Amino acid sequence: MSDSVQKYSASRMGSAPIGPLLLSCSVPMMISMLVQALYNIVDSIFVSHVNEAALSAVSLAFPIQNLMIAFAVGTAVGVNAYLSRCLGEGNRAEASRAAMNGLFLAFCGGIAFLVFGILGARAFIASQTTDAQIMQYGADYLSICTLWCMGLFLQCMLEKLLVSTGRSAFAMASQLIGALVNIALDPIFIFGLFGMPRMEAAGAAVATVAGQWIGAAAGLTMNLLCNKDINLTLKGFRPAGSTIKRIYAVGIPSIAMNAIGSVMTFAMNNILIAFSSTAVAVFGVYFKLQSFAFMPIFGINNGMVPIIGYNYGARQPKRITQTIKLAVCFAECIMLCGLILAEVFPQVLLGVFNASPTMLAMGILALRIIAIHFPMAGFNVISSSAFQALGRGTLALSVSVIRQLIVLVPAAWLLSRTGNVNAVWFAFPIAELVAVTLCAVFMRKCHRDILLPMEAGQKTAAAV
């Protein structure tokens, strides 16, 4: 690729109209994340046709899966934000250094969870249930997901390298490849088709890690062949402490926010298992279904963060403000659609998961109550990503800690004391109401402390 084409690829972040730019960066990732949500749901749909115990087991394994995603995506988000800022400042050498250090960190994360899989997977499942069948399903599933998790870490990092340089379509393609492989392999391994052994819950895990590894291979190929804004080479590479520090200035708050989600789901599983394993299954199904609403918003985030990062480096505050406002509008439209579906068609949504009459009776009301928080969550998700892109990841972390640990879990526990499982679901809208208030306050703070001084600097420079 010529230098002029490379400059155009980066400079459009600072000059193209915000609406078309945000859509061009976000829509491919929205599509790929919808497919990601689809194959997560397909996993659970197939597992639910084994039996409800298998579905409950997968739900109990979710906190560790979410923790792996927290480290993989959080580190990649840090690389995304820092790399985009380097390109905005015209520092391509440091951008390439950020990319290579990001891949090094992804490798380290994969090794860490591999060790956990060997030593702690079975103990983690046993800490949540005494049911022998659920314990066996959960241990089999989680062991495979952790032992082969390197594919997840590399796939997330390689996708974010493509997104951070404005090549969202390639990132979408790599994720689609992995997702389609997962979907195709799920029934084969779970039910033992085409001569394969019937693996049940373990088969879902095998299909998942196979899709992640193939998606990572596709992402690496696309970066090497098509991503000329960065240079991926092991020649002369050494981990750079200063670069890693800048990556984790954004990455650690992002990791912490998602890791808090693992703590929250672990706590909720333990609150709900006191009622029944069906309550845990309902909670697990909700998390699969809500990804259809949240994944497109995460796609908007993936398109928004490099635009904000570039324009932050290029000192263009008006474009930053326009990007955030437009992203919030898109997010609210998506969340309103999710709210309508959950309120009008809960029985249809649960029926897809082979729900028993008991699960339907509990799940219909659960979906309708929890979905109340969707519109508030749209604003909160966009705001938190904007804080990270502006180098204020601690604000996003504060919102996440308060929402999930200080409000949601204690509220759920207190409501569970009523002895009515339906009361527990109200903890979600209560926590989101607190979070939306905090996000509004912090957004005003960022505008006052970051964007207004930037605008004043532009006016001073223009006057001179």
What are these regions (language model features)?
Residues 1-26, 83-150, 196-252, 308-373, ...:
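Short alpha-helical transmembrane segments in multi-pass integral membrane proteins
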Residues 13-45, 49-50, 63-78, 82, ...:
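N-terminal transmembrane alpha-helices
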Residues 23-43, 144, 178, 211-215, ...:
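Transmembrane helical elements of multi-pass membrane transporters/channels
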Residues 34, 38-56, 125-132, 188-199, ...:
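Helix-terminus/linker motif at the lipid-water interface of multi-pass membrane proteins
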Residues 55-115, 152-171, 266-269, 282-340, ...:
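Small-residue-rich hydrophobic transmembrane alpha-helices
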Residues 67-70, 182-187, 216-220, 292-295, ...:
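Hydrophobic transmembrane alpha-helices of multi-pass small-molecule transporters
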Residues 76, 80, 145-163, 171-179, ...:
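Short runs within selected transmembrane alpha-helices of multi-pass transporters and secretion channels
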Residues 117, 160, 186, 190, ...:
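Structural signal for membrane-spanning alpha-helices in multi-pass inner-membrane proteins
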